[in-house]
Amino acid sequence: MRDPEFWHNKWAANQIGFHLEDVNPLLIRFWSDLAPKRSEKVLVPLCGKSEDLIWLANQHDSVQGVELSQIAVRSFFAEHFYTPTVTRLNAQHELYQFDELTLFTGDFFTAPVESVDLVYDRAALVALPEEMRAEYAQRVLQLLKPGGRILLVSMDYVQTELSGPPFSVPEAEIRTLFMGCEVRRVYQDTSIDPHLNKRTQAGLSRFAEEVWVIEKSE
């Protein structure tokens, strides 16, 4: 992943305003739109130490996450008093396993993740600059089984009015990134977003948080 030091430094300095202390209400509200089955495997790219992992592990037998920062993954297990089995896979990746959870540390693009049925992306696509997003979408679709589904949370604003991350990923780009898939927007909220402070949003001409259901063809 390009510029990994940016994210390593964020975690090292505990500058994690992107981290939610609770389960994302959009996950709770819209996960059922994927018609998920407990036996279906889930992937959470760039998972951080998200509480969403716990919620998903209560719904599914296998939840995989990939996170660049070891600090984030170790904090996740420590804060929940979990003691994972840790395996050094290679020079770039470690594997942390505990019950339904399997978390990889290291580069998402090279992590040895198993194929999955479902993907949950709240903070991955919007964390990547435009030049990396096509490669990311290609990697996600490579890992997604035929007929697999993605729940994607995105943001749409005028990029020149605010330097990301989180970056703006407008509808046209999402449809291009996932061309060949069925892409549906199931939610759009143009009110104040909790991830951006009010002063920041006051300088934006428009802002929307959106939720998408994306289905890969059989």
Swiss-Prot record:
Pfam families recorded: TPMT
GO biological process: methylation; response to metal ion
GO molecular function: thiopurine S-methyltransferase activity
Residues annotated for S-adenosyl-L-methionine binding in this entry: 11, 46, 67, 122
Compartments in which it is found: Cytoplasm
Cellular compartments per GO CC: cytoplasm
UniProt protein name: Thiopurine S-methyltransferase
Native organism: Vibrio cholerae serotype O1 (strain ATCC 39315 / El Tor Inaba N16961)
Lineage: Bacteria, Pseudomonadati, Pseudomonadota, Gammaproteobacteria, Vibrionales
Gene: tpm
